[in-house]
Structures are given as C-alpha cells and as structure tokens.
A protein has these predicted regions:
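Short, small-residue-biased leader/transition segments that mark boundaries at the very start
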Residues: 2-7
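General small-molecule cofactor/ligand-binding pocket signal
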Residues: 120-123
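AMP-binding/adenylate-forming catalytic core of the ANL superfamily
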Residues: 13, 17-115, 125, 130, ...
Length: 179
C-alpha cells in the first residue's frame, strides 16, 4: 500500500506538478491547422538563459568532442533576476583551469557566448535513470534546495550513491543568495 502511494505521488509530481491539473510530459509539439502533430524535441532538456532557450543537446554535442571529459550534465539556475548555467563533468584527469578554458572556448566557438557555462564542477558520476536518461531536472531541483526525496525517486536511479556529491556542491558553492 505504501509503495502504491509512493508510485502515485511520483507519477503525479512527474506529470502534473509543473502545470496544475494539466498533463505535462516534457515534449515540445506543434499542432498544425490540419490537426497534425509534429514532435519538436524535449522541453525538459531545455535551458533558459535569461529568456533564451537552449537545448542541452547542443552543449553535450560539443562536450562529447573534448577528450578530457567522460560525461557531463548541465542545468540552469535562477540567480536574482538572471540565470546561470552550471556544468557538472566527470573527467579523465583532474579538472583544472586549462580544461575549464578549453570547455568555455569550445562551447563559445561551436555554439554561442550564451551557451558558455558560468560554473563548472567536477563530479565522479553523472546521475542516470535506470532507463539511461541523464537526470537534469531532478539535479536542478536539488541544486535549487529541494529535498532529495521530493526531487528524485532513488528507486528509479541507476546510481543514487552519486547524489551526495551534488548536495555537497550545492551546500558549499551554490547556497549563498548571490550564488
């Protein structure tokens, strides 16, 4: 019974929390005048950089070409009346200023200056669901201060042990009002 309640609550928060009473599934669609539907991409994998929408895949495509990076996850966080892009990466060697500069230059030249992350943190692992999806939205919720049990269903995670690192980063670097 308790498991059923947990599943129901998780289902509700996944699909009905963002727009009260409206099913929100995370895809952008276009409905034509002939009532045809065209899938245009994932809305939950979209960053909002001061009103400019950026697809995370644009940035991941560039990061995948940087040999020092094993894996990455990028989120946007609201800071006063602005937003910042926060990049988490697992690396093959220690993250230093040379790698950070390489990342910023590559993203700027292959995407745009608006795509460049403000903050870059090294983590041992990027969190994934059991089905292999990066957990961008739950990590964004955790970084913004939401409790883990409200942001993530650990049972749906491939690697829940990595969450402590993200909480530590939030508490150490991202908790001040100025961020």
């Amino acid at each position: 019974r308790q498991r059923q309640m947990c599943i129901r609550d998780s289902y509700h928060s996944s699909y009905f929390e963002k727009n009260k009473g409206v099913w929100t599934h995370g895809d952008w669609i276009y409905i034509s005048s002939e009532k045809g539907i065209l899938m245009q991409g994932r809305s939950d994998a979209t960053l909002n950089r001061n009103g400019i929408r950026i697809g995370t895949s644009e940035i991941y495509t560039v990061l995948d070409q940087i040999t020092e990076i094993k894996d990455s996850l990028i989120i946007d966080i609201a800071v006063q009346k602005s937003s910042k892009l926060v990049l988490f990466i697992s690396t093959k060697k220690t993250l230093d200023n040379e790698i950070k500069t390489k990342i910023k230059n590559a993203v700027k030249s292959k995407c745009s200056p608006r795509h460049v992350p403000n903050l870059i943190f090294s983590v041992s692992e990027i969190p994934y669901t059991i089905s292999g999806k990066k957990m961008e939205i739950p990590i964004k919720k955790i970084v913004n201060g939401q409790k883990i049990d409200q942001a993530i269903s650990k049972g749906a995670m491939k690697n829940p042990e990595c969450l402590k690192e993200y909480i530590d980063i939030r508490n150490q670097y991202l908790k001040s009002p100025d961020q």
